[in-house]
Amino acid sequence: ANSEQAATPDTWFSHKVKSSGISDQKSSGRCWLFTGTNVIRAQVMARTGMKNFFFSQAYNFFYDQLEKSNLFLQGIIDTRKKPIDDKMVEWLFRNPLSDGGQFTGVSDLIEKYGLVPKEVMAETYSSDNTNEFSALLKRKLREDGMLLREASEKGASEKELEQQKVDMMKTVYRMLVYAYGEPPTSFTWAPKINGKYTEKPKTYTPQSFYKEVCGGEDLNANYVMLMNDPSRPFNQVYEIDYDRHTYDGHNWLYINLPIEDIKEMAIASLKDSTICLLYTSPSPRD
């Protein structure tokens, strides 16, 4: 009996943040995007009175992959003078893009492209299962990266390479449309409760929807990433170079703190009914 009780998880919590519904990333590496937008989702539900609401993950993931493709190709142009066995060049070709990420990527994408409700741009097979299409896109990017280096070796100017990149990005965009659908530029929406509109439907752009319905919060200014990395000194700020989602965006920036400090902040966040975003690397021992 004792062993059975020990195996039963304790589901009692002293404090709960009001939320509703579970967002499912399926077989994709988009945990960072789901968790990041869930912070805003709870705020939208509280602001509108809706009992359930979801953002379109396919919308922001489309632009995530578009921006990462540009980040890679621009990186190839920036390193065109370096030998092919240069560590940075090797890293670029080994990691042209991924479906993973972190909160600075969420904030940069939302700031640039806004947000849309799930019903405006639904999930597709490829967005729920990212591995297959991601492999195709990586292959295309590596091919284009080599073409840019070859053009540079033949004397192409930086301006000519930039134009070549624009043409390559058109193909990338078309591939993404086939996989995830074409992102909307405007849509009509209004909050619903029990299947009925609570106000007159209004036309939004993704950017105006984020500002007017979601509050338009400056995520980069109002949120910080905390990390517990015992291998590095605590109480210091760390930045991981080139770990970003957009070329002109923010690198992964975090404050390294003892786990006891992070626990205190997490508890304070929950008591304030503010969702605390959590990334973790679980192991069989956890």
Stretches with model-predicted labels:
Residues 16-79, 84-97, 101-160, 164-183, ...:
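Active-site nucleophile-adjacent alpha helix/oxyanion-hole segment immediately C-terminal to the catalytic cysteine
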Residues 143-244, 252-255:
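Aromatic-residue-lined binding/catalytic grooves and analogous aromatic/hydrophobic interfacial grooves
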Residues 1-17:
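N-terminal regions that are enriched for targeting/export leaders
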Residues 279-286:
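Conserved small/polar residues in nucleotide/adenosyl-binding loops
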Residues 239-243, 247-276:
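Active-site acidic/histidine clusters and adjacent loop/turn architecture
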Residues 10-11, 88-89, 245:
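Generic signal for short, ordered secondary-structure residues
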